[in-house]
Amino acid sequence: MAHDVVLIPGDGIGPEITQAMRRVVEATGVQINWNVQEAGAGVMDEFGTPLPQHVLDAVAETKVAIKGPITTPVGTGFRSVNVALRKHFDLYACVRPCLSQPGDGSRFRDVDLVIVRENTEDLYAGIEFDEGAAEVEELSHLVERSGQKTFAADSAISIKPISIAKSRRIVEYAFEYARRCGRKKVTAVHKANIMKATDGLFLRVAREVAANYPDIEFNDKIVDATCMGLVQNPDDFDVLVLPNLYGDIVSDLCAGLVGGLGMAPGSNIGADCAIFEATHGSAPDIAGQDIANPTAEILSAAMMLDHLGENDAANRIRAAVSATLDEGKQVTGDVRRAQTGSVEGAVGTQAFADAVIEHLA
């Protein structure tokens, strides 16, 4: 059976790594009807938005998409396309496996953990007010009337909503994922010692949900202690479930344990839609040079194939990537540098994909 999938190449190195990914997926023999849709900075002039409505319509029809990285301006300009997609389709669970690969150059070995990040609320909800906005003054008066110490008049404000329903939904997802994938422990990560209302709610809900899963070990950990623990003893962790902001930060930390963002796949899962993507940025400084590492995008495609029920093909891709990295003869410059301290002998993006295809069993 053929599967309908939207492919969003993205900005920067996105077209190169998605081309490599597509070739690997097609080499498995799985039939994919690719619906290629452009989004990002490159379509702003034509459509006046980085995320045109027809792209949303295409994803809504297929309910499965895979994308390359899309540039997000820092501080000014349009808001993140990634965040917009997550909010539009209520892709509430960001799942990022972090698994050591042979030859990844990391000082850590045998890391095998999964980040489950709440994707739709917290400080990333996008409820912000610029310095000088009337809403900032209104909020200042509200805080003052509540008897709490107010903030400086020249502040910009971001609101941090944490709800019972969305906390329960993400923690239940983490436990169901652990049970489905044979994982043994779930750790809820928080800062409830300081943010007693918001993170306190998240922790309380996590404990309530954990009581319904007696077969899965549960603990909770403060986010700063979690960061220290991850770099000291990553073996102590299995599945971590976190609110949005902490999940974003900690997932990048965990990517660093396994060779960097070039090795880190990701998925964004909702009730009836899923979007898969490499977790790194668009790297415009190396775009068009055929030197980007497509490993994360290829492994994200393996996650997509699992989602589509093509588990055999997904496992073949993962094994082929591991074999290519382990052999070490045809790897991109970032991997070569990590392995040997030099980029000498490195191959390009498409040549790496060729090597993965050769290793497909």
Question: What is the predicted function of each stretch?
Answer:
Residues 45-145, 156-158, 245:
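N-terminal glycine-rich phosphate/adenylate-binding segment common to multiple enzyme folds
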Residues 31-53, 228-230:
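N-terminal beta-loop-helix "entrance" segment that forms/cooperates
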Residues 21, 206, 297-305, 356:
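Buried hydrophobic packing segments
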Residues 32-36, 181-190, 213-221, 310-318, ...:
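Flexible, glycine/charged-enriched surface loops at secondary-structure junctions
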Residues 11-14, 63, 116, 174, ...:
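Buried hydrophobic positions in well-ordered alpha/beta secondary-structure cores of metabolic enzymes
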